[in-house]
């Protein structure tokens, strides 16, 4: 099986290609396509376990990516403070020109999370160093 880190450079190039040929909206459409068709594991975990499912999903993914992060899991709140995004780190070390909106691709999770009664907020703190905050709160 191919690890998620092996896709980073390919994703970056695809994002740049789509943007250059068809504009940023086409990149966003692609992210929505991924969300709709390739994140069934996240959707199942959120539907069945809520916040605990989010923690399970991202613990697995971020461990595989060797991310530096802090996760907070509460009854009604879930947060990931990304101290050093491995995707951004890999892109910075490579000779590839990083797609300027690369960090925005994490928005593809929003649609799934919000479908199950949660508010999803993402704050990109430093896109050059790969620092961001993802916050999910259960809606009342």
Name the predicted role of every residue range.
Residues 17, 109-112, 116:
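Conserved short hydrophobic interaction patches
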Residues 1-79, 84-102, 119-133, 138-140:
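N-terminal accessory segment detector
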Residues 101-111:
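ATP phosphate-binding glycine-rich loop and adjacent ATP-lid/helix-beta elements
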């Amino acid at each position: 099986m191919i690890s998620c880190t092996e896709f980073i450079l390919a994703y970056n190039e695809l994002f740049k290609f789509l943007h250059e040929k068809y504009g940023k909206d086409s990149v966003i459409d692609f992210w929505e396509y991924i969300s709709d068709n390739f994140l069934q594991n996240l959707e199942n975990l959120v539907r069945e376990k809520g916040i605990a499912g989010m923690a399970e999903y991202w613990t697995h993914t971020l461990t595989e990516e060797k991310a530096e992060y802090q996760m907070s899991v509460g009854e009604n709140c879930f947060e990931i403070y990304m101290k050093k995004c491995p995707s951004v780190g890999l892109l910075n070390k490579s000779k590839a020109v990083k797609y300027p909106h690369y960090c925005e691709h994490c928005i593809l999770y929003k649609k799934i999370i919000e479908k199950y009664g949660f508010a999803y907020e993402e704050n990109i703190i430093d896109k050059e160093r790969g620092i961001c905050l993802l916050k999910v709160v259960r809606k009342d």
